[in-house]
Structures are given as C-alpha cells and as structure tokens.
Amino acid sequence: MKLLLMSRIDSEETLAYTRTLGIDLENVGFQIIYDTATASALEVNGVPLSSADPDAVVAIGGDGTILLCIQQMNIQRPIIGINRGEVGFLADLEPEEAFSFLKELKPGFPVERRMRIDLSVDGKPLGTALNEAVIVTSRPAKMLRFSVLVDGVRAEQFRGDGLLISTPTGSTAYAMSAGGPIIDPRIEGFLLVPLAPYMLSSRPHLICATRTLAVRLEASKPAHLVLDGQRTIDLGDQATIEMTRSPEPAQFIDVNRNFFSKVEQKLRNL
C-alpha cells in the first residue's frame, strides 16, 4: 500500500516524528511518499498532494493540518490524522499509537464519509469547506444585515457580527465556541450559527442537507468569507453566497471509536 505523509512544518519535533514514522512504515512494507512542503522540510523528494495517488493520506499535526490536506486534494482520498496539535477533534490517533494502527492497515479498510459544503458567490464557484464557512464583517464593531434563504424562500433575517455555516463535522470547532450544538457527524445538514446577533431571538438552525441554502448581504458593508480558516475571500456589496452539499465528501479512515466518547475526552483535556 502507498501512504502519503503530510506534516505540519512549523514544528521540528513533528517533522522528526514524521521522518521516523515514514521509516518505520517503509520497514514493514509500505510505500511512503510525502507532499511537497513536507518533503522540502525533510530534504527528501516529494509530490504535490493535488496530483498524488496514494491509497491513504496520513496528516500529522492539528486540525488545521488535516483541513489543509483535505483542501489540497483534487480527488478525496481516505485520510487519517495523528494529533500533534492542541486539541485535534479531527485527529483519531495519538502519536504513541499511530504506528501500531497503521502497520495493520490493509486494502479494503473501512471509511467514514463526512459531508462537505460547496460554495459559490453570485453564481461563481469558490471552493469547498469541511468544517465551516464564516461570513464576518470587515470592520470591527460594525454589524452586517443578512437574509437566509432556504430553497429560495426567506427563512430568517437578522443583524450581527457574522454568520457561521457549519457541517456536523465542524460543530465541534468554531460553531461550538459560538454557542452551537454538537452534532453527530453521521447526520447531514447545514448548521447556521449567528455570531453576536443583535436580537436574542436569532438562534442556531439545523437545515437538511438536501436543501439549497443562500445567504444574502442586505447592506453595502464590507465583509469576508472564510473557508475552514484556510482561505479568505472579500465579498462585494449585497453579495449572495450559495451553499449546497458537495457530491464529494471527505473520507476518514474509520478507527472504530465512539464519536461522543472522543468528544468527551477532547473537551476534558481543554
């Protein structure tokens, strides 16, 4: 089997761990390749993640590394994260157990598919998010005015600092910090969480993933759209952001662990 290793490159300890893990996996018969950035840091040959064809991808770092990895894949490959960050809700393995798990990986391993969101602005495709898309004001202390449309029908109108649109996977990330609920990732839907809404009646909404969702900026105030904390797009006046369930979900290697048990453990360690 061919595994691609992608490491956070701002940590010498993580890079050293990645180098050792790659050697150990090669010694038990795996073909190991590295993405370009990791390879450069390790001074070995690498391949762009966008054109690589591994059987699985191993992301070594925090949730940001895993999100970046998924963003860079043109075709979604099975992925597993090794936590070398702070919390690591998306990382299913800790460093001390990773080699023992990976060396037993065989073709046909189980995969859990996670919903992603395709986004466009005024009809122009922008990209895909696994955790969340966040619409925020570009000017601190200046509120935005939104309309939320579901299948073309206005369902909500409010003012606030911004609006967070999350997947169930992202419900343990920014959405949780903003007061949203924790959602089982096997559920598919759009979680809308207002950020500092002016009216207390503006509450989180969970909308079925089969619906088409749009958010319209109702006033001419500068705003940004941020995808998974990785990419920021300037929004024009009175822009409309359209969202649909992506036909290509993320694929996480299933380690057969209870989601809520993992969440409880991660939250306890905060």
UniProtKB/Swiss-Prot annotation:
List of catalytic residues: D63 (proton acceptor)
Enzyme Commission code: 2.7.1.23
Broad enzyme group: transferase
Domain of life: Archaea
Cofactor(s) recorded in Swiss-Prot or TrEMBL: a divalent metal cation
Reaction(s) the record says it catalyses: NAD(+) + ATP = ADP + NADP(+) + H(+)
Subcellular location: Cytoplasm
GO molecular function ontology, one term from the record: ATP binding
GO BP terms, alphabetized: NAD metabolic process; NADP biosynthetic process
A UniProt-annotated Pfam family: NAD_kinase
GO CC annotations on file: cytoplasm
Binding site for NAD(+): 63-64, 131-132, 142, 159, 161, 172-177, 196, 230
Keyword annotations: ATP-binding, Cytoplasm, Kinase, NAD, NADP, Nucleotide-binding, Transferase
Role according to the record: Involved in the regulation of the intracellular balance of NAD and NADP, and is a key enzyme in the biosynthesis of NADP. Catalyzes specifically the phosphorylation on 2'-hydroxyl of the adenosine moiety of NAD to yield NADP.
Family: Belongs to the NAD kinase family.
Name recorded for this polypeptide: NAD kinase
Species annotation: Methanosphaerula palustris (strain ATCC BAA-1556 / DSM 19958 / E1-9c)
